[in-house]
Amino acid sequence: WIMGHMVNAIAQIDEFVNLGANSIETDVSFDSSANPEYTYHGVPCDCGRTCTKWEHFNEFLKGLRKATTPGDSKYHEKLVLVVFDLKTGSLYDNQASDAGKKLAKSLLQNYWNNGNNGGRAYIVLSIPNLAHYKLITGFKEALTSEGHPELMDKVGYDFSGNDDIGDVANAYKKAGVTGHVWQSDGITNCLLRGLDRVRKAVANRDSSSGYINKVYYWTVDKRQSTRDALDAGVDGIMTNYPDVIADVLNESAYKAKFRIASYDDNPWETFKN
């Protein structure tokens, strides 16, 4: 999965997919009542990027729905996964469940079109704080009470705080999550980060007792760091330059081993060689 980083304006969906992304990451900010409000990152952000592009969250969802609904004039067949980077740092811990419920209702209405031929992309809820695990239970409760528990088949999870892998496993246990787990590791492109924790995550993914299904590394903009991440065995790379990742995947060393994921590749299944 080539994951376009910080795609917060509707116009950027086309831009990143046209550069080679089959997945995008979108920032979601919340108001003081735990309603998802804007797709917005703000300052500071990655080096070389404009930090202030934004849409109202529900409007972004409508644009995203068009981009992922077969038959729509804006449809992109290869856009198959969306990571919502949930900026829950503005919320109190006891608002996490409400945030999950409100997020689910927004998605149900504006992205899934109330279960009637909505967008088809798989969705990852990426949460920065382990203490906010109830966002997951709230999300699930809302979809169930709205009569669409089947949409949970399209939803996966990530805790993005670079926490100890054992602590992450514990948070999932509390949330009742037993699958659909992506594990991120990374740092802003302005700084360097080694691959030690990525290797631990990959080892967990590949062990019979692990909880992780997929591992992604962020934010990678250079060819050599792309090669290093691929050599470590990641499933996804988040980038500001999807074309760079696509170029490296075309190199002879990687062409035989990796390919770009399509809609038929289940993002919740651990890949077995």
From Swiss-Prot:
Pfam family, one: GDPD_2
InterPro entries linked: PLC-like_Pdiesterase_TIM-brl (IPR017946)
EC code: 4.6.1.-
Tissues where this protein is expressed: Expressed by the venom gland.
Active site per database record: H5, H41 (nucleophile)
One GO term describing the cellular component: extracellular region
CDD domains in the cross-refs: GDPD_like_SMaseD_PLD
Disulfide bonds: C45-C51, C47-C190
Function: Dermonecrotic toxins cleave the phosphodiester linkage between the phosphate and headgroup of certain phospholipids (sphingolipid and lysolipid substrates), forming an alcohol (often choline) and a cyclic phosphate. This toxin acts on sphingomyelin (SM). It may also act on ceramide phosphoethanolamine (CPE), lysophosphatidylcholine (LPC) and lysophosphatidylethanolamine (LPE), but not on lysophosphatidylserine (LPS), and lysophosphatidylglycerol (LPG). It acts by transphosphatidylation, releasing exclusively cyclic phosphate products as second products.
Name of the featured protein: Dermonecrotic toxin LapSicTox-alphaIB1aiv
